[in-house]
Amino acid sequence: MSRARRVLCRACLALAAVLAVLLLLPLPLPLPLPRAPAPDPDRVPTRSLTLEGDRLQPDDVFIAVKTTRKNHGPRLRLLLRTWISRAPRQTFIFTDGDDPELQMLAGGRMINTNCSAVRTRQALCCKMSVEYDKFLESGRKWFCHVDDDNYVNPKSLLHLLSTFSSNQDIYLGRPSLDHPIEATERVQGGGTSNTVKFWFATGGAGFCLSRGLALKMSPWASLGSFMSTAERVRLPDDCTVGYIVEGLLGARLLHSPLFHSHLENLQRLPSGAILQQVTLSYGGPENPHNVVNVAGSFNIQQDPTRFQSVHCLLYPDTHWCPMKNRVEGAFQ
């Protein structure tokens, strides 16, 4: 064997030995795949409620304020001075008497319902009937009813309504009872009466209806039908709304803790949450201490309802708010 062939054979043997050693070595483990991040329980899902709701503008909301001629003085002027000044195009005042001066202050959005000024079930239902018809005429997406002792936070209201679709059956508010109301439904023609149970949102805290639901209510609510429907159960206006929505249409009241009436203990509302509420109220002469506990530049004698204090915290740039509020608001 020539010397060249011997060298080649040795090289082949060496290569074979190296390959044998490599085959005996353990194979390396595959690199682990990167893990998906653990879900964050506090993170809001990408598909949030707002994607299913409306992109609302302030003028999409119709706010009806129910009042009476005797409250056209300080009570209603307080609302015009505070929250209505921030939502003038949204707000319509429904009353029972003409008042040219107040009509001018309200920008022409005060409506004389020609209903009785006496606080009876029939008079209340008369006003609600007019409110409902005016809302349908407006073409707006949402109807919200409040009383003349409510402070409305327009920003909170718009934010809340934006989480729903106005095409869906939405009835939103706060019940004053912890159980459904039970009523006797009188059948036309003097037939057998039925017992019906349903929830209703108290008008004293305010409530809202989507246009989709309001249109379905039309056979029992439009063009004066609301009053005859109320006579079937002989209940006030807010109860009749609940009767139509739940008892006749089978929709449901969505209970919201953001609406407040004078019937609850308002001092129990946490002060840190007051500015996020949709509506507030106050106790009035019969219960003057039932007001929200909010600090402000006005004392209780200057601001017995606490509405001015709340307003200056929400809108410190208001010209009549104390300078302290305006300076603090500039740095927020």
From Swiss-Prot:
GO terms for biological process: cell differentiation; nervous system development; pattern specification process; positive regulation of Notch signaling pathway; regulation of Notch signaling pathway. It is a single-pass type II membrane protein. Has some activity with cobalt but not with magnesium, calcium and zinc. Signal peptide: none annotated. Its EC number is 2.4.1.222. One of its GO terms (molecular function) is O-fucosylpeptide 3-beta-N-acetylglucosaminyltransferase activity. It catalyses: 3-O-(alpha-L-fucosyl)-L-threonyl-[EGF-like domain protein] + UDP-N-acetyl-alpha-D-glucosamine = 3-O-(N-acetyl-beta-D-glucosaminyl-(1->3)-alpha-L-fucosyl)-L-threonyl-[EGF-like domain protein] + UDP + H(+); 3-O-(alpha-L-fucosyl)-L-seryl-[EGF-like domain protein] + UDP-N-acetyl-alpha-D-glucosamine = 3-O-(N-acetyl-beta-D-glucosaminyl-(1->3)-alpha-L-fucosyl)-L-seryl-[EGF-like domain protein] + UDP + H(+). One of its GO terms (cellular component) is Golgi membrane. Its main location: Golgi. Disulfide bonds join 115-126, 144-208, 312-321. Residues 30-332 are lumenal. Optimum temperature is 37 degrees Celsius. Glycans are attached at residue 114. Substrate binds at residues 75, 148. Detected in all the examined tissues (12.5 dpc). High expression found in adult brain. Its cofactor is Mn(2+). The active site is at residue 238. The chain crosses the membrane at residues 7-29. The keyword Cell membrane does not apply. Keywords: Developmental protein, Differentiation, Disulfide bond, Glycoprotein, Glycosyltransferase, Golgi apparatus, Manganese, Membrane, Metal-binding, Neurogenesis, Signal-anchor, Transferase, Transmembrane, Transmembrane helix. Glycosyltransferase that initiates the elongation of O-linked fucose residues attached to EGF-like repeats in the extracellular domain of Notch molecules. Modulates NOTCH1 activity by modifying O-fucose residues at specific EGF-like domains resulting in enhancement of NOTCH1 activation by DLL1 and JAG1. May be involved in limb formation and in neurogenesis. PANTHER family: FRINGE-RELATED. Belongs to the glycosyltransferase 31 family. This is Beta-1,3-N-acetylglucosaminyltransferase radical fringe. It comes from Mus musculus (Mouse). The lineage of its organism: Eukaryota, Metazoa, Chordata, Craniata, Vertebrata.
